[in-house]
From Swiss-Prot:
Region listing for Disordered, in residue ranges: 105-131
Protein family per UniProt: Belongs to the tropomyosin family.
Keywords assigned: Allergen, Coiled coil, Repeat
InterPro entries per the UniProt record, alphabetical: Tropomyosin
PANTHER family in the record: TROPOMYOSIN
Coiled coil: 1-284
Protein name: Tropomyosin
Chain's role: Tropomyosin, in association with the troponin complex, plays a central role in the calcium dependent regulation of muscle contraction.
Entry remark concerning the domains of this protein: The molecule is in a coiled coil structure that is formed by 2 polypeptide chains. The sequence exhibits a prominent seven-residues periodicity.
Keyword tRNA-binding included in the entry's annotation: no
Quaternary structure and partners: Homodimer.
Keyword Signal: no
Amino acid sequence: MDAIKKKMLAMKMEKENALDRAEQVEQKLRDCECNKNKVEEDLNNLQKKFAILENDFDSINEQLLDANTKLEASEKKNAEIESETAGLQRRIQLLEEDLERSEERLQSATEKLEEASKAADESERGRKVLESRSLADDERLDGLEAQLKEAKYIAEDAERKFDEAARKLAITEVDLERAEARLEAAEAKILELEEELKVVGNNMKSLEISEQEASQREDSYEETIRDLTQRLKDAENRASEAERTVSKLQKEVDRLEDELLAEKERYKATSDELDSTFAELAGY
């Protein structure tokens, strides 16, 4: 009877120990489940951060491409402006040369007109001298008349030359007015071009500043890209580590579940044995 009681006490203690071990296993299982959930949550957070980093990386790449496109457009615009400026400077030079030639023609016509005027004055003086001498010397009248006719011819010729010179002068004046008008237009265009050049200079300065800023932003983007790439690698490493940790925890959970199942089976066997023992005692 004492042996049976000792056996019952031993079985009871074994049962209590089995219950304690089962509770410990269940606690470990709950802890593992909690750790597993935490790791899975960390893994989800890392995956979200990884997606955000990928979006930031794509956005920065798009901004960098846009900055490069704007820089190429500004450089092309500067080249077009420089080409147009060179063409306008060439046109101004041609207008100045045309004006110089017009001034030379005007000066030549003026000199010819002065020569014709001097010849007419000389003829007029000769005619007056001949008229005054005709009263005193009748014998020289025929000669003087001949000289007068010649003088008239010279005067008429000079008059024709004067008219021709006047006509050429009028043409020259028209050419001069046109040249002056072209010169005024050219001067106005020069002023306009100077203003445009000032604006272009300011724009070029702004573009240089923008280019420097774009270069700085590009350096910053490259640094950001390197940082994001490193962070991406770190995130991938952490994700891999988290996956390995989850795998280990899953194995531990499986092991603890197996232990719990074994403890439950041992508990069931102990309970069945106690029930059988109690039934035998009740039979006595």
